[in-house]
Amino acid sequence: MTTEEPQRPDLARELIARATESAAHRAKRVRNQLDAVQLGQGRHTDHANTNVLRRILAEHDWPGHHLVDSEAARAAWSIALHSDDDPAFLRAAATLLGRAVQADDAPVQHWAHLHDRALTTSRRNQEYGTQLLLRADRIELCPLRAPESVDKRRATVSLPPIAVALETVRRRYMPNGTAYEVPSVVLAEAA
């Protein structure tokens, strides 16, 4: 990673602002603090964020840390992760993020998460075990290809063993053994 100034600080600010707003909304959703109108507003925000990221990808490819800095690159990744309504966009974003990883312009862990999200959104088994379902009484791993070798695959992308990741998520989202009495929610960033 680099500490030099980003080439496009304007894009960095926009990505960070959008991801921050979306994260605040998502935190309320996980705690079941939103009514139907607010849930709809969140979906609208995700759609608008997807369109902004789509424009950025078309103009610049993946907005990695050279273009926008590490914080904004993480924001772009977060926005992409929540583009569930557009599986084709998720796949395209994962491809561009993969190229950025190869150019040392983005973390490989971000690619693994986005790759898994693109797979699960397309109703395919994930590779790295990053996609989870938060239920009222438990956390479930979304379907996984070859679960017996997931830790080997996770190691290739600098992710901890699946048992460690699941325990971290359980402590974060189920501190008292329940998940805030919430409906099912897909967790992407935690695993």
Model-derived features: positions:
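Short intrinsically disordered terminal tails
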Residues: M1, E189-A191
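N-terminal helix-rich structural modules
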Residues: M1-R123
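Mature-region segments of soluble proteins
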Residues: R74-V186
